[in-house]
């Protein structure tokens, strides 16, 4: 992984991990289309660390509030307020994806990484699902109204994000909209519930990398990838949360349809060969 590739793919990760357009699809399809070599474990660590840093910095006040609320809930042995419930709802929503990811992430990645046609189709299919949820969802509920059942349902949907082309933020926002939450509530809970998942993935891959050792010459690309994905990730979170306050998610749906259609067309017409 050279420095330029690390910067470009780091920025691509930061943007596409946050926006509902699938980071895994872009990180597979872009190198495939450009003929770049596959990124290894070192760069996977950079991407996850960068994304985690972006989320932690942006949601730092929420994280502190949840920590205080957790202590308060334990102290009073009560979950009688939305603030006291939120940390436990975030944890509950992360459980399904954590279990499925631990058991099947490697198999799913190997199954779809070499099948760009399926990735293109999933971009289209789940883009349509996002569009329908945004169009027909009632949007009457706020994030403070999330219940345990809501958190578990959204968490189950998050399991699908292991499939390239689905999008973690996209599928969880879709689930939130289907459950009647407004766009801001669905998006904000989507990001908060991603914190333990992204943290766990970053820690797991980092431990694996430390066990293997950082390959010679990859220290600088590793740092560049972390910074690039962190900066663009932070900007993308801020942008999306402002965007959904006043606008629909339709532009992201159209992007998914066009990008997925382009990938499918390239493959079926043999242009990539």
Curated annotation (Swiss-Prot):
The keyword Membrane appears for this protein: yes
Keyword Secreted on entry: no
Subcellular location: Cell inner membrane
Keywords noted in UniProt: Antibiotic resistance, Cell inner membrane, Cell membrane, Cell shape, Cell wall biogenesis/degradation, Hydrolase, Membrane, Peptidoglycan synthesis, Transmembrane, Transmembrane helix
Pfam families: BacA
Transmembrane annotation, as ranges: 39-59, 86-106, 117-137, 146-166, 189-209, 220-240, 249-269
EC number in record: 3.6.1.27
Catalyses which reaction(s): di-trans,octa-cis-undecaprenyl diphosphate + H2O = di-trans,octa-cis-undecaprenyl phosphate + phosphate + H(+)
EC class of the enzyme, as a word: hydrolase
Membrane topology category: Multi-pass membrane protein
GO terms of biological process kind: cell wall organization; peptidoglycan biosynthetic process; regulation of cell shape; response to antibiotic
A molecular function GO annotation: undecaprenyl-diphosphatase activity
One Gene Ontology cellular component annotation held by this UniProt entry: plasma membrane
NCBIfam families for this protein: undec_PP_bacA
Family: Belongs to the UppP family.
Miscellaneous field: Bacitracin is thought to be involved in the inhibition of peptidoglycan synthesis by sequestering undecaprenyl diphosphate, thereby reducing the pool of lipid carrier available.
Functional description taken from the UniProt entry: Catalyzes the dephosphorylation of undecaprenyl diphosphate (UPP). Confers resistance to bacitracin.
Protein name: Undecaprenyl-diphosphatase
Organism annotation: Pelobacter propionicus (strain DSM 2379 / NBRC 103807 / OttBd1)
This protein's encoding gene: uppP
